[in-house]
């Protein structure tokens, strides 16, 4: 258990953050915490995860969080754009205030990491192997295919598409479908295979989305890294970590 004094941010992530939750969805939480002095100087990151029947909690070392923001990965951004965000330490609040700049500070890496996640989900889906993930098993057993992974492919591809369409100004609406009833219904229909599509039909469906993000690659890759924003992230997190360490030594 992480000492409350070492916690920087708490938030709800996963389907509740993207607006794609239903009455069967459990709650995913992420807690960003500061390292102890020993962890800091040993270089050891103490990330860990606890899984309960209705709630999963991931503890994220703030140094890992910093790297995920500088690389502009979905895993980092979902904390900034999550649901029910609680900034426990105000020294970290400038990060949240500047989240829109952070979301576009490394667009090439955002594209590569997100499209890579989509491709891994595609490989998992097309393998037709029963997934290890307990959340996906329910859908595999019901439909004889991992339709939860299929929805994730569509969601990741749509996020890249919508963010580019907004000219990289509105990650919130690109990432979260809470206020988009049509988009939300579409995603949940994919997950629940409302159209009763065969596996082969869903593979072709996934290929369409994978092809659509291939077209976006140049649009993302032509942007350079925003070193000023990267430096800002580093400065805020390093200072907040130092202050926390002094207060709680």
Identify what each model region corresponds to:
Residues 28, 66, 148-150:
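Extracellular structured ligand-interaction cores
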Residues 93-238, 247:
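Conserved nucleotidyltransferase catalytic core and NTase-mimicking acidic/glycine-rich helix/loop elements
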Residues 18-52, 153:
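Catalytic metal-binding acidic patch
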Residues 1-16:
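Helical scaffold of the NTase/Pol beta-like nucleotidyltransferase catalytic core
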Residues 5-8, 22-24, 232-240, 247:
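Non-catalytic regulatory/linker segments of enzymes
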Residues 41-131:
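A basic- and aromatic-enriched beta-loop-alpha substructure that forms the phosphate/nucleotide-
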Residues 36, 72, 163:
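Phosphate/oxyanion-binding loops and surfaces in catalytic or ligand/nucleic-acid-binding neighborhoods
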């Amino acid at each position: 258990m992480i000492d409350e004094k070492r916690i920087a941010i708490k938030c709800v992530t996963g389907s509740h953050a993207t607006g794609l939750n239903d009455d069967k969805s459990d709650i995913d939480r992420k807690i960003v915490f500061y390292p102890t002095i020993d962890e800091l100087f040993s270089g050891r990151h103490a990330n860990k995860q606890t899984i309960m029947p209705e709630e999963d909690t991931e503890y994220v070392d703030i140094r890992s969080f910093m790297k995920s923001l500088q690389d502009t990965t979905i895993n980092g951004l979902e904390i900034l754009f999550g649901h029910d965000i609680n900034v426990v330490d105000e020294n970290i609040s400038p990060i949240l205030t500047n989240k829109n700049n952070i979301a576009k500070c490394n667009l090439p890496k955002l594209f590569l990491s997100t499209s890579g996640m989509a491709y891994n989900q595609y490989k998992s889906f097309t393998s037709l192997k029963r997934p290890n993930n307990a959340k996906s098993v329910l859908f595999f057993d019901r439909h004889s295919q991992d339709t939860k992974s299929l929805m994730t492919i569509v969601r990741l591809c749509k996020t890249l598409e919508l963010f580019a369409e907004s000219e990289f100004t509105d990650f919130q609406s690109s990432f979260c479908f809470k206020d988009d009833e049509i988009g939300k219904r579409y995603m949940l229909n994919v997950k629940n295979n409302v159209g009763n599509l065969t596996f082969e039909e869903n593979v072709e469906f996934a290929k369409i989305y994978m092809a659509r993000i291939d077209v976006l690659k140049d649009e993302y890759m032509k942007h350079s890294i925003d070193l000023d924003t990267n430096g800002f992230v580093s400065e805020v997190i390093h200072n907040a970590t130092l202050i926390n360490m002094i207060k709680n030594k």
